[in-house]
Amino acid sequence: MVNAEDLFINLAKSLLGDDVIDVLRVLLEKGTEMTDEEIANQLNIKVNDVRKKLNLLEEQGFVSYRKTRDKDSGWFIYYWKPNIDQINEILLNRKRLILDKLKSRLEYEKNNTFFICPQDNSRYSFEEAFENEFKCLKCGSQLTYYDTEKIKSFLEQKIRQIEEEIDKETKLGANKSH
C-alpha cells in the first residue's frame, strides 16, 4: 500500500518533475521546519538552487513558509515545511485547472470548423484550410470536412466527470471540517 508521503512525492514529481523531489524529501524526512540554508547544506547544493525549488513547490501548494527577521543582520529568514495535509486541496486545484482547459478546448471545438487531410490526418481550422486552398500543407492532398461531434461528446463527458469529482470532493472536504 502506498503511504501518504509517497503519494505526495509522486504528485509533486508528476506536476513539477524530478528536480524538486530532493528538497521535498529532506523536508518530509526532517518533519519540522527548515531554512533554505539548512536544506542546501544537507543536500550539498547552492542555496539559490534550493530557493528556486522551494518557490516552485510553494506555487503548487506543496510547501509553505513563515518568515522572521534576523535581529543581527536585519535579513529575513524563511522557515519551510511540507504541506502534506494539503494533498487533497492540491489535487482538487489540479482538477480545476484541467477542467478549465477542457472547457476552453470544448469552446474552441464548438466555435470552429475543421478540415482534415485523408493521407496524414493533419487537422486544419477553416481559416487555415481556406488560406491553403483546402490542400494539405505537408502532402498537397485535398482536405475533407472533419466532424468534431465525437471530440465534443468526449470533452463534454470528461467535463461532467471532473465536475462531479470536484463537487463530490468539495462536499467531502466541507463535511470533514464540521
Swiss-Prot record:
InterPro entries: TF_E_archaea, TFE, TFIIE/TFIIEa_HTH, TFIIE_asu, TFIIEa/SarR/Rpc3_HTH_dom, WH-like_DNA-bd_sf, WH_DNA-bd_sf. The keyword RNA-binding does not apply. It comes from the Archaea. The keyword Protease does not apply. The winged helix domain is involved in binding to DNA in the preinitiation complex. PROSITE patterns: HTH_TFE_IIE (PS51344). GO terms for biological process: regulation of DNA-templated transcription; transcription initiation at RNA polymerase II promoter. Keywords: DNA-binding, Transcription, Transcription regulation. Residues 4-88 form the HTH TFE/IIEalpha-type domain. Monomer. Interaction with RNA polymerase subunits RpoF and RpoE is necessary for Tfe stimulatory transcription activity. Able to interact with Tbp and RNA polymerase in the absence of DNA promoter. Interacts both with the preinitiation and elongation complexes. Pfam families: TFIIE_alpha. Belongs to the TFE family. GO terms for molecular function: DNA binding. Transcription factor that plays a role in the activation of archaeal genes transcribed by RNA polymerase. Facilitates transcription initiation by enhancing TATA-box recognition by TATA-box-binding protein (Tbp), and transcription factor B (Tfb) and RNA polymerase recruitment. Not absolutely required for transcription in vitro, but particularly important in cases where Tbp or Tfb function is not optimal. It dynamically alters the nucleic acid-binding properties of RNA polymerases by stabilizing the initiation complex and destabilizing elongation complexes. This is Transcription factor E.
